[in-house]
Amino acid sequence: MKIKTEFFQDNGFLIIKNFYSKKLIYKIKKNIFEISKEIYKKYNSNFLKKNFNPNNFDYFVLKARKERNNEVTSAVYDACKKLSGFYEIISDKKLNKIAEKLIGSRRLGILPGGFGIRIDYPKDRYWKARLHQDYTSQLGSPNGIVCYTPLGNLTQRKGPVILYTKSHKRGVFNTKVDLSGLKKKKTYDPYYIKISKKNLKKYKIKYLNLKETDLGIFHFLLLHESGFNSSNKIRWSMVHRIFDFSHKQAINQNYIGGLMEGNIFDKNKNIKYL
């Protein structure tokens, strides 16, 4: 497989079509269906039998969401991170070789707080990821990649991830804290990138519209945000992050995690903007 390293370095992202097998995707969907069915059944006495359908594998998750059954949706979210099929995605040997070429290092690590399966519900704005860079939120190393594969083909209505191509070349953008959104319960995320609309428009937008066997990769420093899911289906995303242990800044900050682990730049002398 020929890897377009120069394209990645220039644009900050790469899409590899049909990277994962349909069999593996099917396995993960089936596991989610079976787990969500058992959890839903535990909390609902009026349980109706439902057979597995790969195109409707999240039937019980969506049903629980509509019924506002947070016990079910929270339990499913936590359980998804423990699926053996998901670990097959993370530990893929071909992907590791690709990561070595794109990152330019053979000393790679996976951020423990940076992998899981995202569940973006229809019409939900609260959990929509704001404009950010994964280095700021995850740290580990400024030299790293985000690996992204959907469960189910993405459409524009499902709100694919929005990439701002070539923005990684700018380095780390200034990250500010705004608690007003939290207080008004409009968002879970108090952090935002300080950039004008004029400057943001300098970067060409790429929508990460992928099929469920595709692999999307983008740089830790690339600006991106969630699209809005205006469909009536859940947008499922399998995500993990690979970083470079050998990078000087990674060593200086002791490979510490970022905002997602409660570490803010001005509270740790080892953490700094590039």
Where is each model-derived feature located?
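Active-site region of the double-stranded beta-helix
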Residues: L108, Q133-G140, T149-P160, K166-H168
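Short, solvent-exposed loop/turn segments at secondary-structure junctions
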Residues: Y20-K22, I117, T136, N153-T155, ...
